[in-house]
Amino acid sequence: MPNSTGKIAQVIGPVVDVAFPINDNLPEINNALTITRKDGSQLVLEVALELGDGVMRTIAMDSTDGLQRGMAVEDTGGPISVPVGKDTLGRVFNVLGDPIDDGEALDLNHRRDSIHRDAPKFEDLNTSSEILETGIKVIDLLEPYLRGGKVGLFGGAGVGKTVLIQELIHNIAEEHGGISVFTGVGERTREGNDLYFEMKESGVMENTAMVFGQMNEPPGARMRVALTGLTIAEYFRDVEGQDVLLFIDNIFRFTQAGSEVSALLGRIPSAVGYQPTLATEMGQLQERITSTKKGSVTSIQAIYVPADDYTDPAPRTTFAHLDATTNLERRLTEQGIYPAVDPLESSSSALTPEIVGEEHYKVATEVQQVLQRYRELQDIISILGMDELSDEEKVIVARARRVQFFLSQNFNVAERFTGQPGSYVPVEETVKGFKQILEGKYDDYPEDAFRSVGRIEEVVEKAKKMGFAP
């Protein structure tokens, strides 16, 4: 049966109502419709609601400027589909899978997959307890990431989520050589542009596909771009049998776009103005990000926390789907500790003796205990000063401060801003360094020698340069 043709009934911003003849074959929900503008360009709409009497309410994937009532609208007969496969590596796409870099157009016969798909069946799932080494000390020691797991980077505005994601892409591509898919959802175009050229310069881009739906795009594009990136990642997992890294920056913007679309469709909002379907939409996305018997998708998602409020429904809904959380804390940036990861609020289901080993688990637990005790003593220190502490407490505070500074390190991707070379620290070296600090081996060394260094040997070198003689 031929696909039906309708006409624009009304345009309200990014929402377009399309009237089809009532006796026609009406398009299904999530089908893509196309409008050919007067200049020959095409606008894609996605069916969101059926209003009755043959009228379908749709969301535009691009600007609706220049549309008029009565313009012809074609049903494509299926959902939005995007190119997948090895030809997507090294390229940058928009929500519709059109290349937006300066490369060649893809072959028209190239394989395309629908962005709306079911999550893998229960019997196809595979659970892994293998650690993914990142080379970032605070992560590898205290909240190790699982291969095939879901990780959330939580933080307010300007605490370093995007820089941390860039460093993870750099380290994992350099050390593990895996395929990465980076999805920019509602973030700054400048950051995406910088990331693209940085990755091209470092040679990482040839194993990476990038998909962008940035801040200036209509809410429909920002809502669907995460699914476009996920569809590209799923192909490498299911068909090529690869282990894929999926970076999403920022998952909050996915929720925010869904909230805008929901309001435009006339749904009654729920708590704090979010869409009533928030948990469903998040579940449909997150359940597709998983490991199967063929391959794995490890996802690292930046999550903006509005006004640093972790009880907000958007970050709270995301929490339920994660294996590990990395919380970025503003007070640590104020102390000049980067990455500003809160070692006590961050967590991982992988931090168990069975997965990381006895020694790693013991050192990580001791680090957390020392930092927790230091946090408890800070009130006494701020009111009465260090003199009121017992000798044992003074030792705990001194070691905790050295541990806290040693959790910081320079990033490779920040080298051009800081002028300091970045460091990649293997897990064994990280565990060894913290074990020696906790044993008191470096109690006499100046605190500043522990700031922004990689391995423990660098502390000794830095202390010597500062004129310290052990």
Curated annotation (Swiss-Prot):
**Matching InterPro entries:** AAA+_ATPase (IPR003593), ATP-synt_VA_C (IPR055190), ATP_synth_F1_bsu (IPR005722), ATPase_a/bsu_AS (IPR020003), ATPase_alpha/beta_chains (IPR050053), ATPase_F1/V1/A1_a/bsu_N (IPR004100), ATPase_F1/V1/A1_a/bsu_N_sf (IPR036121), ATPase_F1/V1/A1_a/bsu_nucl-bd (IPR000194)
Question: One MF term from GO for this chain?
Answer: ATP binding
The gene designation is atpD
Q: What is its main location?
A: membrane
- Residues reported in the UniProt entry to bind ATP: 155-162
Topology with regard to the membrane?
Peripheral membrane protein
Q: How does it assemble?
A: F-type ATPases have 2 components, CF(1) - the catalytic core - and CF(0) - the membrane proton channel. CF(1) has five subunits: alpha(3), beta(3), gamma(1), delta(1), epsilon(1). CF(0) has three main subunits: a(1), b(2) and c(9-12). The alpha and beta chains form an alternating ring which encloses part of the gamma chain. CF(1) is attached to CF(0) by a central stalk formed by the gamma and epsilon chains, while a peripheral stalk is formed by the delta and b chains.
Provide the function of this protein.
Produces ATP from ADP in the presence of a proton gradient across the membrane. The catalytic sites are hosted primarily by the beta subunits.
Could you tell me which SMART domains the record lists for this protein? Answer: AAA
Q: What is this protein called?
A: ATP synthase subunit beta
Where found, per UniProt?
Cell membrane
Catalysed reaction equations from the record: ATP + H2O + 4 H(+)(in) = ADP + phosphate + 5 H(+)(out)
